[in-house]
Amino acid sequence: MSSGCRSVGGSTWGNWRGDGGDLRQRRVLSPVCSAPAAGSWIGSQLGNVGNLLATPHPLGKPASSRVGTIVLACLLLFGSCVVRAVPTTPSPPTSTPTSMSTHSHGTVDPTLLPTETPDPLRLAVRESGILAEDGDFYTCPPPTGSTVVRIEPPRTCPKFDLGRNFTEGIAVIFKENIAPYKFRANVYYKDIVVTRVWKGYSHTSLSDRYNDRVPVSVEEIFGLIDSKGKCSSKAEYLRDNIMHHAYHDDEDEVELDLCRPSLQLRGARAWQTTNDTTSYVGWMPWRHYTSTSVNCIVEEVEARSVYPYDSFALSTGDIVYASPFYGLRAAARIEHNSYAQERFRQVEGYRPRDLDSKLQAEEPVTKNFITTPHVTVSWNWTEKKVEACTLTKWKEVDELVRDEFRGSYRFTIRSISSTFISNTTQFKLESAPLTECVSKEAKEAIDSIYKKQYESTHVFSGDVEYYLARGGFLIAFRPMLSNELARLYLNELVRSNRTYDLKNLLNPNANNNNNTTRRRRSLLSVPEPQPTQDGVHREQILHRLHKRAVEATAGTDSSNVTAKQLELIKTTSSIEFAMLQFAYDHIQSHVNEMLSRIATAWCTLQNKERTLWNEMVKINPSAIVSATLDERVAARVLGDVIAITHCAKIEGNVYLQNSMRSMDSNTCYSRPPVTFTITKNANNRGSIEGQLGEENEIFTERKLIEPCALNQKRYFKFGKEYVYYENYTFVRKVPPTEIEVISTYVELNLTLLEDREFLPLEVYTRAELEDTGLLDYSEIQRRNQLHALRFYDIDSVVNVDNTAVIMQGIASFFKGLGKVGEAVGTLVLGAAGAVVSTVSGIASFLNNPFGGLAIGLLVIAGLVAAFFAYRYVMQIRSNPMKALYPITTKALKNKAKTSYGQNEEDDGSDFDEAKLEEAREMIKYMSMVSALEKQEKKAIKKNSGVGLIASNVSKLALRRRGPKYTRLQQNDTMENEKMV
């Protein structure tokens, strides 16, 4: 904005000084006029007047004439300008973008304007200032030295490659043992084939065939198979609670040699007594013929058992429901066994026979025998902890690096490009079942690798450590140190006067060989004291304490064994997660190493730039310290330190004046002058005149001046915008978007790769993969055998026949008496067996609920029969003729009467009485004969002579009694009469 009105007459007089100080005429007259636009006529005239007044007259006229010229110019000026008193509001804005009036907004309260003096010109100048719309302004008091700072000395840049703890060593990785425990077993059984053949006149056909497998008794295995290499042709087996016998070719029992069959299976051996099946056909046609074949078979097969080893399967398809580690020893009795105890037998020091070479084994073994309903199985018993192991060796790693990172161990194996993660705590092998083999195999493998590769270059720095990695992998790790590093440790020990053997220090296992390890003392390590005469009381106390310690230790061990919960280690079927972990760790280490190098270079660069900062602070301490502290401060160098004061934020209003010219005609302000208040709502007396500094800093003094120059152009930051001055006169506000930004920053956007841990994930579990098939052969076989055992021959279902046991005992007794005794025993046992069978059958029939119902029906039927018998007897007594000869009915009687010419109405008065009497005599005679026969039978049954004599006497009496029987005539007299 122009600071004065240009004179019409174009006078060129000098300065005018008033009481208010050296104020240029154009600055005094400018606020009197209305705010003209830049380049307007009034503004140009005011500028000309100011220039005339500022230029001295060449003729050197006196000052009085200059005063008159000034008065005349003012009169002309007031004639062309609209003179205003102290305005209450700034001039309204115009449409011109460069007008100074666009920077005055709203109505200004007169109480907020500065009122140091009642000079209306000064009030007008302040009122015409530019109010800052937004932005923060600060005022900084001069530093006095109460607060001093210094520049930080150069830093030591870190070396990131030494920030992690690495340990090298040898490792053996174990996985879950999913393979079954395999062992050799012998199967003994007799194959029975019973055929039934029908022989016709010209053909023969097979009508029935029965096939069964029966076990060979353990006694026969001892006495024949493993003793002579033979087998009996007799088969004795129990089916349906009945002992059956079968003989080969239906002949007497003989001993047959065991021979190799013509067909041999791979991985198995077998021996049998015959290759043929007997089928007997007789010479007589139209009959059934039955024949029996008994083939004794011994097979050497492979047996398998999986954890928890409660059963095992044979390659023949049979499943034995007992643990292969079951035995009669203390530790083996706790194993599973589903069979009755009499079916199991264990023999110590057994020497089996090789059926091919007919030679017995040299080394005795402990042999187990189990007799199932169909086969007898034998195998060599071994201890479970020695043979079975739930973990198996997977990889031997000759170079492994262990890295401790964020509370976990990372085992990196470059040979297989895998990284395994585990906890920092060691895994206890006792917490998993059957892991005794791990320590032995790990030690052997690690020692073998060490002797081959590292014995001359490295030493062990610890014992074997076990860690359970994610995915179910057990890592047996033994750390090592190079000889050079070990020498450094040795030198450090010597320097610190610690004379220890390096081998014993780095390898604790060496102490075990020398027996120099100091053991922890306990009451168990103290030998049992022997009482003496001098210290009887002390020895008794030691004896009691030692006994308590032994009991406490035994109790603790037993409680630990029973309370310990063993958990099987499950291993994933793939290590892709470990390979991904290795790849990610490799990328992470490479990228982080690269970024660490950049950070190291950055730190080195900062140390070098620190020297530049130290020199620049001597030139502009406030700017350097403010940039360093990221805070507005005023600074001043005090020797080798810097005095600072913190800048205060201005809460009041800040007004920017529109001219940068000072009272001196040759001197101008290098920064725009401002008027401001420290706090809000301050009165006119609280206004302060100052000068705008860099970055919205307000100086409380106006000391920044420079000689006035032509064609001067300046941009100053005022709030959040910029103001443009031309020839020390405000022109307009400039938004920051109109000024192109040149960035001095070099972007360094570094982000370290975060740690990621890959977990093993299984899309399909092992159980799902096993269940994908249509049929499960193992389950089908198990169900079939369990079905047969459950409903037919399992021990818990079949009741023991005590009578059969007694009979077998009696038969054995008679058999021991020789051939005669055996014959007598057969006769006696036959009769006794018949009686026992009858009684047992009746008892079984009565115990059956259907038998009870049948007996009830029989009782009812007996009562009905008794009723009819009683009725029949009574009928005989009342009318014996009708009862004995029911054919003499009324119809026959009527027919007889009709034949004699009588009517039905006629009575029976003409009936022949003589014939009736004869009939009665005949009936009486028949009754007597019947009674006589009964008496004779009783006498014969009792074998009594009196009865026989009485019977004979009765016969004689009957013979002589009564007339003799005369034959009746062929023709009836009545019929003859009718015929006549």
Curated annotation (Swiss-Prot):
Query: What residue spans carry the Polar residues bias annotation?
Result: 1-14
Which residues bear sugar attachments? 165, 275, 380, 423, 497, 514-515, 560, 727, 749, 952, 971
UniProt topological domain (Intravirion) ranges: 871-980
Keyword line = Disulfide bond, Glycoprotein, Host cell membrane, Host endosome, Host Golgi apparatus, Host membrane, Host-virus interaction, Membrane, Signal, Transmembrane, Transmembrane helix, Viral attachment to host cell, Viral envelope protein, Virion, Virus entry into host cell
Specify the protein's topology with respect to the membrane: Single-pass type I membrane protein
Region of interest: Disordered: 1-20, 88-118, 505-535
Post-translational modification remark: A proteolytic cleavage by host furin generates two subunits that remain linked by disulfide bonds.
Q: Which SUPFAM superfamilies match?
A: Viral glycoprotein ectodomain-like
Q: Motif Internalization motif residues? A: 965-968
Q: Where in the cell is it found?
A: Virion membrane; Host cell membrane; Host endosome membrane; Host Golgi apparatus membrane
Q: Could you tell me what this protein is called?
A: Envelope glycoprotein B
User: What species was this sequence derived from?
Assistant: Equine herpesvirus 1 (strain HVS25A)
> Source gene?
gB
